[in-house]
Amino acid sequence: MTALTDPTKGDGMRTLVTGGAGFIGSALVDRLAHAGHEVAVVDDLSTGRLENLADAFASGRVQHTEVDLAGPDLAEAVAAARPEVVYHLAAQIDVRRSVSDPLHDARVNVLGTIAVAKAALEAGSRRLVFASSGGTVYGEPDPSALPIDEHYPPGVTNPYGVAKRSAEDYLASFAELHGLEPVSLRLGNVYGPRQDPHGEAGVVAIFCNRLLADEPVTIFGDGRQTRDYVFVEDVVDAFVAGGEHPDAPGARLNIGTGVETSVLELYQALREVAGFGAEPAFAPARPGELARIALDCAQAGRVLGWRPKADLADGLARTWAWAFQEVNAGSVGG
């Protein structure tokens, strides 16, 4: 098997990014367009913003189609793009909503993934890189096993994790039956520029927005719950490698840092970057949330040659600088 592109020759390819107007998706679109690839963005704009694609549109290599993943127009949009590689990032990402409305979560995260895979096959796509969840597919891990690798058995903590694991398995069946090349990236808690401060899964963005608005920061639970925070540009590196590396097909890979950071430690680190910030308020813990998680990402290094580059201090500084600029421009907050 050969790589899909030879970056030394500047070969472009046809790509498609679902959720490409969102936080991670738009960063990936920027990278692909800058590398000379044609990018079709499929996004229903329920949470994504076309403003995130302003620079990508200026390249002349990016087009957007507003499509519901589970709707009848998806196959036509994918067929029109004829992508060699599909990057599937569109998702329902709110763990709390998966608990309160598991039918909606399954419709988007399971049926939507099946629909994307089917459309990709029909369009002649060779590879599909899927945004899975390293924070939920393993359930509540044994603390003594942290950081956990991909051999850790799957567990059940919330419907979101169940849906992501089911989607991975469906993609594996498409590989077995139809020859699709799936790559599932089990992401840690991704943060960075363009993350929605009004969303449900972006604690760094929420904290930045609260600090900049001089509003109190609320931490759910005692703040000692840990996450593996990974910077968005490092995650984009992993997606690009997943789409191009000859050894990637069939892999299910953790993408994180291997470092546990508590919510309290995260907030303190952000206060140090900002240079100000009051003590947080506390509220009851939310159902379905993990107590601790950290991901062993050595396998991603072996398969993709990937490793995270940004440590938490650097990533938070870059995220804070972006959020500060956006507030001054009137784009964030309110």
Per-range role (PLM):
Residues 2-4, 312-334:
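Amphipathic terminal alpha-helices
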Residues 2-190:
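N-terminal Rossmann-like NAD(P)+-binding domain of SDR-like oxidoreductases, especially those catalyzing
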Residues 28, 239-243, 267-270, 297, ...:
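Hydrophobic "lid"/C-terminal helical patch
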Residues 48, 100, 108-111, 151, ...:
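Residue-level signal for the nucleotide or nucleotide-sugar donor/cofactor binding architecture
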Residues 115-119, 229, 234-241:
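Conserved mid-core alpha-helix of short-chain dehydrogenase/reductase
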Residues 165, 190-206, 215-216, 220, ...:
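Glycine/proline-rich active-site loop of Rossmann-fold NAD(P)-dependent oxidoreductases
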Residues 222, 250-253, 261-268, 275-292, ...:
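C-terminal "lid/loop" region of Rossmann-like NAD(P)-dependent oxidoreductases
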Residues 235, 239, 255, 266, ...:
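Non-catalytic, hydrophobic alpha-helical segments
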